[in-house]
Every structure is written in structure tokens, then in C-alpha cells.
A protein has these predicted regions:
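Hydrophobic positions on the long internal alpha-helix
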Residues: 51, 66, 99-103, 107, ...
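Catalytic loop of short-chain dehydrogenase/reductase
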Residues: 108-155, 164-169, 179
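A glycine-rich helix->loop->beta "capping" turn
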Residues: 31-36, 54-67, 73, 159
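C-terminal helical subdomain
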Residues: 162-163, 181-256
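The beta1-alpha1 cofactor-binding region of Rossmann-like NAD(H)/NADP(H)-dependent oxidoreductases
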Residues: 19, 39-51, 82
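Conserved glycine-rich Rossmann-like NAD(P)H-binding loop of the short-chain dehydrogenase/reductase
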Residues: 2-23
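Substrate-binding pocket helix/loop in short-chain dehydrogenase/reductase
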Residues: 76-77, 81-86
């Protein structure tokens, strides 16, 4: 039973993205954990600091920080409004940097502290930038935080890693914003990312840091051999996610 603070803006149901911080908290508590739902705009410096302080006070400290907040717009440069550019950078890059920054004093007191970004490997291939430059810049900003903070915090024993899915993941965002039912059927369940993240947090923070992990490859390294349980629909070819390097090969049988 983990103690989990859920810090996000969604206090009221969104017409296209189901669930709120409160429904997520209910699910955590039904599973045997303790939850602290906090309404937080990751662009707001005071709100982020307050959320971290409240979490540490409620649970007696902070062991893990997951930077998952993200804004997406898959538009090319002429079609990207500057307010959308700013939003993506404020949430993805700045939000990740700021949350990590203010978490450091709390994490320094933890026994096995981890920061995990849900962000991709830094594969500097033109094909990831040309179709949606603004989004890629913002998303890679999160990954640059991994690269820099892993080195900066290594001497303090704080691990900083990135985790990214090989395939699309069946979330409300995929359903309503990216590909509808067809893409959902070609996706994996969120549990693959949850299992991979859990495996990361069990690692020795002093030794396991600065890694850019692809979900199935990492789980395979941890001894997982059965990946069919993560599929939404058996027999439907899985849709690849953005940003997975061509050099990253799936484990044997993982995509079958």
C-alpha cells in the first residue's frame, strides 16, 4: 500500500478526458494505498512548492517523484500558435524542471529517492522534429532534465531516469485526441508502464540512474517474458509510439 499524492489540474470532469484527481484517489485507496489529491497547476511555482510541502507533511516525507504532466499538439510550425507553444514548454519542460527542483530537499532525506520522467530517449532524428517541432522540443526538454539532473544529483544519491512506451498506451488521450477506437485496439494497457515504473523504484537509487528506458525492453531485462497480457486486443498489430529509436529492438516475442 503506497502513499500517493496526485497533483494535477483536473478537479472537475473533462468532456474528453475522463476521471479527476479525486476518482484516481478513490482507486488508489480501494487498492489498499493512501491518496492525497491536490489541485495543482504545474505552471504555478507557489502551487508546486506547496503541493510538495503538503505531501511531505502528510506522509512524513517524499521518496519518489513522477513527472507525468504533459501538453501535446501535433501541429507543424505554421499551424502552431505561440500560446500553444508556450503552454507545451511551460508544462512539459518548465513544469518538470520546477517540480524536480523543489523536490530535491525532500528527496535528500529519503532512503532510496527516485525521480522518474515519462519522457523519451534523446534520439536526435529529423523525423521526430519535422512534423511537430514545438511538441518535440517541449517533450525532449523533459528528457534533457533527466540527462542533467542524473549527473547533478548522483553524488546526493538521487536517481533520475526516464521511462517511455514502445507502443501507444490505451488512455483517454489516445481515445479522444489521437486515434479513437482503432488506435485504442492497437495499444497496450497502462499496466505495462505501471509495472515498469514499479520496477524502477525498486532499484538502488545510487546505482541505477541516468537511464532512458523503453517499457518492454526494461521489463524483459527484469525477467518478464509474457507481454500479451498488456495488449488491449489480441491479434491486432501494435501501434508504435513516437520517439522510439530505430536501434531499440523489442524483446523476442514481445510484439507477437
Amino acid at each position: 500500500g503506497a502513499n500517493v499524492a496526485i497533483a494535477a489540474k483536473t478537479a472537475e470532469p473533462h468532456p474528453k478526458l475522463e476521471g479527476t484527481i479525486f476518482t484516481a484517489a478513490e482507486q488508489i485507496e480501494r487498492a489498499g494505498g493512501r491518496a492525497l489529491p491536490l489541485t495543482v497547476d504545474v505552471r504555478d511555482e507557489d502551487a508546486v512548492k506547496d503541493a510538495l510541502d503538503r505531501t511531505a507533511k502528510e506522509f512524513g516525507g517524499i521518496d519518489i517523484v513522477v513527472n507525468n504532466a504533459s501538453a501535446i499538439s501535433l501541429s507543424n510550425t505554421p499551424k502552431t500558435e505561440m500560446k500553444r507553444f508556450d503552454l507545451m514548454h511551460q508544462i512539459n519542460a518548465r513544469g518538470t524542471y520546477m517540480t524536480s527542483k523543489y523536490a530535491i530537499p525532500h528527496l535528500e532525506r529519503a532512503e532510496n529517492p527516485h525521480i522518474l520522467m515519462l519522457s523519451p530517449p534523446l534520439d536526435m532524428a529529423e523525423k521526430w522534429f519535422a512534423p511537430h517541432l514545438a511538441y518535440t522540443m517541449a517533450k525532449f526538454g523533459m528528457s534533457l532534465c533527466v540527462l542533467g539532473l542524473a549527473g547533478e544529483l548522483r553524488s546526493r544519491g538521487i536517481a533520475v531516469n526516464a521511462l517511455w512506451p514502445r507502443t501507444t498506451i490505451a488512455t483517454a488521450a489516445v481515445q479522444n485526441l489521437l486515434g479513437g477506437d482503432a488506435l485504442m485496439q492497437a495499444s497496450r494497457r497502462p499496466e505495462i508502464m505501471a509495472d515498469a515504473a514499479h520496477a524502477v523504484f525498486l532499484k538502488d537509487a545510487k546505482a541505477f540512474t541516468g537511464r532512458f528506458l523503453i517499457d518492454d525492453t526494461f521489463l524483459s531485462e527484469e525477467g518478464v517474458t509474457e507481454f500479451s497480457k498488456y495488449r488491449v486486443t489480441a491479434g491486432v498489430p501494435l501501434a508504435p509510439d513516437f520517439f522510439v529509436p530505430e536501434t531499440s529492438l523489442a524483446p523476442p516475442g514481445a510484439l507477437d
